[in-house]
Regions:
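Active-site metal-binding loops of divalent metal-dependent hydrolases
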Residues: 24, 176-177
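Conserved active-site-proximal phosphate/metal-binding subdomains
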Residues: 150-172, 178-319
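Active-site entrance/lid segments in N-terminal catalytic domains of soluble metabolic enzymes
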Residues: 1-166, 170
Length: 319
């Protein structure tokens, strides 16, 4: 394992590297969270779609596999969000990752319990509101990210420096990041850490069908399409199903996406041509399926290598 880094995010989350796993419904559960944390990153259990009993089970699984810190993502708009938070508090989770709504209504309970909280945003307005609510950091998601994204259309390269200049709290970059160069670029823009999602899907341990992983690594950066921009935009790989939905108006596309249900279950029962496969534009940079620890160590090693190369250029050397 690479030598641990130390900055505001690693200290806040208690991890070795400032790399957190993007929460993915029914995919990043207890086992995946533990694997990421054991590899030096910060694993996150996605509570979306889990009952109280399910979440308790996944927390126990994670704790049986790692002694390292991990967090739980709670989409605020979900009807059982308060219940999920209650489980996290009762079971001693130290970091809650809120998204899809304002965290303000939960902040009193979170702070009383002594939890740390990070919140996902995709715009300046959302970030300022999250900071005012009292979150400890924000995950800023650029438009090139996979899965459900913001409607603002602002890319990571533009969103991150704008938020860094405007906020007092740390910013974690999300969207278009999957290697050491992306990690270093995010840090150069002022982020204190990164979130990875699509790159995590393309790991040996990720519990999605192999055709999903193969489709990602065989794709170019322009192989994705954004569906349902009105209410719940989602970036996915192009195939027969997405081509049909892309021809609908936004409202109809939103209904069609909702009717598909969870992406993992669709993939389990479908094929590369018929499954809805959330995927970011970073797919064009992912060369193959690797273990999680190799992905993370490669990002850290790669970032250091790029930094050394840039150092020689800045100091007057040749690239």
């Amino acid at each position: 394992m690479e030598k641990p880094w130390k900055n505001t995010i690693t200290e806040l989350l208690g991890c070795d590297y400032p790399v957190i796993s993007g929460p993915m419904r029914l995919i990043t559960l207890g086992r995946m969270a533990a694997i990421v944390s054991n590899a030096g990153g910060f694993g996150v259990i996605a509570a979306s779609g889990l009952s109280r009993e399910d979440l308790v089970r996944e927390l126990r699984i994670a704790r049986s596999l790692t002694a390292r810190p991990f967090g739980v993502n709670i989409p605020v708009y979900r009807p059982n969000a308060a219940e999920a938070l209650e489980v996290c508090i009762d079971m001693g989770v130290r970091v809650v990752y809120t998204s899809a709504g304002s965290p303000a209504k939960f902040m009193d309970a979170i702070k009383r319990a002594g939890l740390r909280v990070i919140h996902k945003v995709s715009s300046m307005d959302m970030a300022r509101k999250a900071q005012s609510a009292g979150v400890d950091a924000v995950v800023a998601m650029g438009f090139e990210a996979g899965g459900h994204i913001g409607r603002e259309g602002v890319t990571t390269f533009c969103l991150i420096p704008a938020l860094v200049r405007a906020l007092r709290i740390p910013v974690i970059a999300s969207g278009g990041i999957g290697d050491g160069g992306g990690l270093l670029a995010a840090l150069a823009l002022g982020a204190r850490g990164v979130e990875i999602g699509t790159a995590l899907v393309v790991t040996a341990e990720c519990p999605v069908p192999e055709f999903f992983k193969e489709a990602i690594v065989q794709s170019a950066s322009n192989a994705t399409v954004v569906l349902g921009r009105e209410a719940m935009p989602i970036r996915v790989l192009r195939n027969i199903v997405t081509s049909r939905v892309a021809g609908m108006d936004d409202a109809a596309a939103d209904r069609a996406i909702a009717a598909q249900g969870d992406a993992r279950y669709v993939a389990d029962g479908g094929t590369r041509d018929t499954a809805v496969m959330p995927c970011g534009q970073v797919a064009g940079l992912l060369a193959g399926v690797v273990p999680v620890d190799e992905l993370l160590s490669g990002m850290i090693t790669g970032a250091r290598s790029v930094l050394e190369s840039l150092g020689s250029i800045v100091c007057g050397g040749r690239p």
